[in-house]
Curated annotation (Swiss-Prot):
Gene: rpmF
Gene3D superfamilies: Single helix bin (1.20.5.640)
Family annotation (InterPro entries): Ribosomal_bL32 (IPR002677), Ribosomal_bL32_bact (IPR044957), Ribosomal_zn-bd (IPR011332)
Source species: Ehrlichia canis (strain Jake)
A GO molecular-function descriptor: structural constituent of ribosome
Single GO biological process annotation from the record: translation
Disulphide bond pairs: none
Highest taxon listed in the record's lineage: Bacteria
Assigned GO CC terms: large ribosomal subunit
Pfam families in the record: Ribosomal_L32p
NCBIfam families listed in its UniProt record: rpmF_bact (TIGR01031)
Name of the protein described by the UniProt record: Large ribosomal subunit protein bL32
Length: 61
């Protein structure tokens, strides 16, 4: 079984674990609809960067 030759310092241990964390989603408010949306994603109204890029069917079917 492998055994470390030297003790790993707290700094190196924490740097090793730096990617093992929960990340906060990048949520913003859409300027056209006022709803919350993920950054760099299209909103539910079909808008991206304040321009309509997708026609959304609002009939509810």
């Amino acid at each position: 079984m492998a055994v470390p030759k030297r003790k790993k310092s707290k700094s190196r241990r924490n740097m090793h674990r730096s990617h093992c964390r929960l990340r906060v989603p990048n949520i913003g408010i859409d300027k056209t609809t006022g709803e919350y949306k993920l950054s760099h994603h299209i909103c539910l109204g079909g808008y991206y960067n304040e321009k309509q890029v997708l026609e959304v069917d609002t009939s509810g079917v």
